[in-house]
A protein has these predicted regions:
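N-terminal Sec signal peptide and the immediately downstream disordered periplasmic leader
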Residues: 1-12, 17-79, 85-90, 203, ...
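Outer-membrane beta-barrel translocator/receptor signature
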Residues: 122-124, 136, 145-148, 154, ...
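Outer-membrane beta-barrel domain signature, strongest for Gram-negative TonB-dependent receptors
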Residues: 209, 231, 235-382, 389-393
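Outer-membrane beta-barrel architecture
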Residues: 18, 86, 107, 171, ...
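Acidic, small-polar-rich N-terminal luminal/periplasmic segments of exported/outer-membrane proteins
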Residues: 41-180
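Mobile, glycine-rich extracellular loop/lid and propeptide segments
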Residues: 101, 106, 143, 181, ...
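Outer-membrane beta-barrel pore domains and translocons
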Residues: 55, 173, 187-193, 217-219, ...
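Flexible glycine-rich, low-complexity coil/linker segments exposed to the extracellular/periplasmic environment
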Residues: 343-348, 409-434
Length: 434
């Protein structure tokens, strides 16, 4: 095979050589015309320069030595990328996936979360919003809103971006308010499964020095799956995203930016089918417990920038809070289902239910960066910075298990008031009132 392939290459090369000799005079005659045409083509064709902040300074992507993927808002729009999970399809080396129905795993080049972790475990891929470190991994479940671009940096980034960036960093850059004039757009999407999605973004110049940009995304969609026991619609979507961004020009070379972003999800939850579920349809399952999923995520940020001449001073501060509430069938089966294989073959599944699991994640950050505008001694770019970080996680799991397998179905129907239980529930959680 190798000899045959080599023969073909040599044969084609010979023909090309002969062809070049035969038409060489013609090429010389047309050389001037071709040169002029090529010059015109070069003038009319140019590659758009992409500006990124991968090294905490604005510079052309072609000048950055790091491995960076920069995705513009137009590219995200064209490819229908609406959240972090969608980035996996178009970003080399990046994996973002939903896990266990309400959590997210993320890795870059295999470094990060490959399996689900507990509520306080942090991935090895850092998330930033307009340069502000976002600590809660529940923020990966939010929808994109009014994005300018997304930068994905592959490889260790701890020197510039700090903790949790061994695998890399994702930086989401939002569109800035502008004082150039009023600008707005809105659209409505309607699809199958009852999908109704509305979006809008509006820029308002308040004065010569103050402008604001406000955006919203509202999504409603029926579920893709059904629980045949209680008729619950699963894998549905009921999301709302809001963002308000304000830019104040405090001087000729300084500015203050204030923004607030809010995301809320109130869904029935994800379809997590058990291994021995008897329903043949992959989009149907049989579970005796109802499920519920609620997530609220909010961030208030402030960014102050001033040009000092030789360097640029940037101060970033934020307060963040993520609240999550989950109810689910933790055994993934209907009461009475048995193990079909393995060491427990023939034995029934132990009924279990989260009633509920809750997490409250509160974060405060304060960061100062001084970034050189001109190289030191003509060849050294430098950055000096400091970061204050306060991160608190409060996680509660109330799990009910029928260890004796004597449960009646109506005792674990998911109808209960969270945190309000009779005293008997402490010793007998399967009492009907628990």
């Amino acid at each position: 095979m190798r000899g045959k392939m080599t023969y073909k290459i040599l044969k084609n090369s010979t023909l090309l050589f002969l062809f070049t000799i035969l038409i060489s005079n013609t090429i010389k005659a047309d050389e001037a015309i071709e040169t002029n045409n090529q010059s015109s083509l070069n003038n009319s064709f140019s590659i758009e320069e992409i500006i990124v902040t991968a090294e905490k300074r604005s510079e052309s992507l072609q000048d950055v030595s790091k491995s960076v993927t920069a995705l513009s808002s137009d590219e995200l729009e064209t490819k229908n990328i609406i959240d972090f999970v969608g980035l996996s399809a178009i970003t080399p080396g990046l994996t973002v996936a939903k896990n266990e129905g309400y959590k997210t795993v993320i890795s870059i080049r295999g470094v990060g979360d490959e399996t689900n972790q507990n509520a306080i475990a942090a991935p090895s891929v850092a998330l930033h919003m307009d340069g502000i470190f976002v600590a809660s991994k529940f923020s990966l479940r939010t929808d994109f809103i009014d994005i300018e671009r997304v930068e994905v940096l592959r490889g260790p980034q701890g020197t510039l971006f700090g903790q949790n960036s061994t695998g890399g960093t994702i930086n989401v850059i939002s569109k800035l308010p502008s004082s150039d004039g009023f600008e707005g757009k809105a659209d409505l999407t309607v699809g199958n499964y009852g999908l109704v999605k509305s979006r809008g973004s509006f820029n308002f110049p308040i004065s010569d020095n103050v402008s604001t940009r406000n955006s919203f995304v509202i999504t409603e969609r029926d579920g893709f799956s059904d629980n045949v026991i209680n008729g619950q619609d699963l894998d549905d979507a009921s999301h709302i995203s809001l963002r308000s961004d304000w830019l104040i020009e405090t001087g000729d070379s300084s500015s203050l930016r204030l923004f607030f972003q809010y995301f809320d999800a109130d869904n029935n939850g994800a379809a997590m089918k058990g291994l021995d579920d008897k329903t043949p349809n992959p989009r149907k399952l049989a579970q005796d417990s109802a499920s519920d999923y609620k997530l609220s995520s909010e961030i208030f940020g402030a960014i102050f920038e001033v040009d000092l001449g030789a360097a640029n001073l940037k101060i970033l501060a934020s307060t963040q809070e993520d609240d999550i509430y989950v109810v689910r069938d933790n055994d993934r089966h209907n009461f009475g289902d048995v193990h079909a294989s393995g060491p427990l073959e023939g034995l029934p599944y132990i009924a279990a239910e989260f009633r509920p699991e809750t997490s409250i994640v509160e974060t405060k950050t304060f960061e100062i960066n001084i970034v050189s505008n001109e190289p030191l001694f003509g060849s050294i770019d430098w950055i000096v910075g400091a970061l204050y970080f306060d991160h608190e996680i409060e996680n509660h799991i109330y799990e009910v298990k029928d260890v004796n397998n004597v449960k009646l179905i109506d005792l674990m129907d998911g109808q209960f008031t969270p945190y309000v239980h009779a005293p008997i529930c402490a010793t007998n959680p399967f009492e009907g009132i628990c």
